[in-house]
Design a protein with these regions (language model features):
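Phosphate-group recognition and catalysis centered on beta-loop-alpha active-site segments
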Residues: 1-214
Length: 214
């Protein structure tokens, strides 16, 4: 059975991405979510996509150089709140699937914190474009559902090669790969991002999709 996740909690166009309000709505509809993780200067793991606040809050400051308090002091001016991962875990009530994508490089300290935060979760995966993140967390705890994320320009041969790595349990790739039959040789779960219309959802109903707009 295909697995459907909502991209950054964007179940509706009116929602703000990676917010507790958006996540809660997805959970009421019985959908899991995909979200992005960064670490702040004071080592708080937050749900936020970009490396800086420039796009969202018109402030050209990097997440890694700001504390959690400083980030939300800026976000508040835009009527926004950037949540911590632990807040997301709490509202998921251990019933809804969480795909946690590590956007930035996570230190050993950050990864250990992540492992501790997720140790009671039943339904989740940890993914990243940065293979070092996945290798390093595998060293710390092997029995985790870990995955690599690939861009739309990644050669299929490279994807197939990476799929054979022992620490790669799932693969996440751009939706242009949905029609690529060569990937059928991979005997691991594959997720495709980001489906933004119901036509794709219907056409590929047998695939694991990360989508927006119910």
């Amino acid at each position: 059975m295909a697995h459907l996740l909502i991209h950054r909690g964007l179940a509706k166009k009116s929602f703000k991405e990676n917010t507790l309000q958006a996540f809660k709505y997805c959970f009421t509809k019985k959908y899991g979510i995909e979200t992005d993780l960064h670490c702040t200067k004071d080592n708080i793991i937050i749900c936020f996509h970009d490396f800086s606040l420039k796009k969202k809050f018109k402030t050209n400051k990097l997440i890694k150089n700001l504390t959690f308090y400083e980030i939300n002091k800026i976000a508040k001016k835009f009527d926004h709140y950037v949540p911590q991962l632990k807040e997301l875990i709490k509202i998921s009530k251990n019933k809804n699937y969480l795909m946690l994508e590590l956007k930035s490089f996570f230190s050993k300290k950050n990864l250990t914190q992540l492992i501790n935060l997720t140790k009671k979760l039943k339904f989740f995966s940890i993914t990243s474009f940065n293979e070092k993140n996945i290798k390093n967390i595998y060293i710390l705890k092997k029995k985790l559902n870990l995955g690599l994320v690939f861009t739309s320009t990644t050669p299929i041969e490279r994807i197939i090669k990476k799929s054979r790595l022992k620490y790669v349990k799932i693969l996440v790739m751009e939706k242009r790969f949905l029609s690529k039959k060569k990937l059928d040789t991979i005997n691991k779960p594959i997720y495709y991002y980001t489906a933004r219309n119901k036509k794709i959802k219907r056409k590929y109903s047998d695939k694991n999709l990360i989508f927006e707009n119910l």
